[in-house]
């Protein structure tokens, strides 16, 4: 009876048991991805995140192609397969950990396994989906609302005391509408910068290559396609300036 109970527990918590076993490999893979992401930057911070940066997976694939050109190696093939499996599981797990019923555990996993550069006093609420967390910075006192999507593949920098309301979407990559297969385009990707004390209302969407200035307010439901001035209030689709916020 005890054995059956133990088997049931293993089945219920199987995802988390696999995660615990793979914690170290997951951190190593994310560390490699972060190094690749920052490879062409002048420094090792995200303060200049508006620069166009290569995606980590593309760099890894390019490296593998160069190695393959030099000849076949079973060890190299196995290494590549293992890396791809762990990398894929990492992308899967970060989508499932968002539902773990513990704010403390979620933030610990984001910071130390997926290498999200988040301040201890920042808050990431239930259901937030983070992509490429190793290229995401969240400053002191900032709040990420429930069910937000932070697509940090090209880098996202969120300053201090920023408020992202529920279901805010930040997209650093998009598709080319003129391409017959809607493939990605270098002109449709770029980092997003959100200055300190900015407030993004519920269901705001911010597209690639956008800088939202300090203290700016983006009204609920807006779609931001261009830079927003500091302390400006913008609204609409596409977002346009409708006023200014007090600087006091």
What feature does the model see in each segment?
Residues 100, 106-107, 128-138, 143-211, ...:
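Flexible, glycine/small-residue-enriched loop-and-beta-strand segment within the central core
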Residues 200, 218-220, 235:
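Short glycine-rich loop/turn motifs that provide flexible caps or phosphate-binding loops at active sites
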Residues 229-230, 235-238:
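Acidic, glycine-centered active-site loop in nucleotide-sugar glycosyltransferases
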Residues 208, 217-219, 223:
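A generic "structured core" feature
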Residues 1-114, 197, 237-248:
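Terminal amphipathic alpha-helical/low-complexity segments used for targeting or macromolecular assembly
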């Amino acid at each position: 009876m005890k054995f059956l109970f133990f088997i049931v527990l293993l089945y219920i918590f199987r995802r988390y048991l696999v995660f615990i076993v793979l914690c170290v490999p997951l951190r190593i893979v994310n560390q490699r991805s972060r190094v690749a992401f920052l490879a062409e930057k002048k420094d090792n911070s995200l303060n200049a995140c508006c620069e166009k940066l290569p995606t980590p997976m593309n760099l890894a694939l390019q490296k593998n192609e160069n190695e393959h050109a030099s000849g076949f190696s079973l060890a190299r093939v196995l290494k590549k397969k293992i890396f791809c499996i762990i990398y894929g599981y990492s992308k899967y797990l970060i989508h499932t950990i968002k539902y773990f019923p513990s704010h403390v555990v979620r933030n610990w996993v984001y910071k130390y396994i997926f290498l999200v550069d988040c301040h201890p006093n920042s808050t990431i609420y239930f259901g937030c989906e983070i992509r490429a967390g190793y290229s995401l910075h969240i400053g002191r006192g900032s709040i990420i609302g429930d069910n937000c999507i932070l697509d940090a593949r090209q880098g996202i920098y969120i300053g201090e005391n920023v408020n992202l309301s529920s279901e805010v979407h930040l997209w650093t990559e998009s598709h080319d509408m003129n391409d017959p297969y809607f493939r990605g385009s270098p002109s449709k990707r770029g980092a997003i910068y959100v200055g300190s004390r900015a407030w993004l209302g519920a269901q705001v969407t911010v597209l690639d290559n956008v800088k939202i200035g300090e203290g700016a307010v983006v009204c609920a439901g807006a779609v931001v396609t261009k830079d927003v001035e500091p302390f400006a209030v913008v609204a609409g689709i596409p977002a346009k300036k409708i006023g200014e916020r007090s600087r006091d």
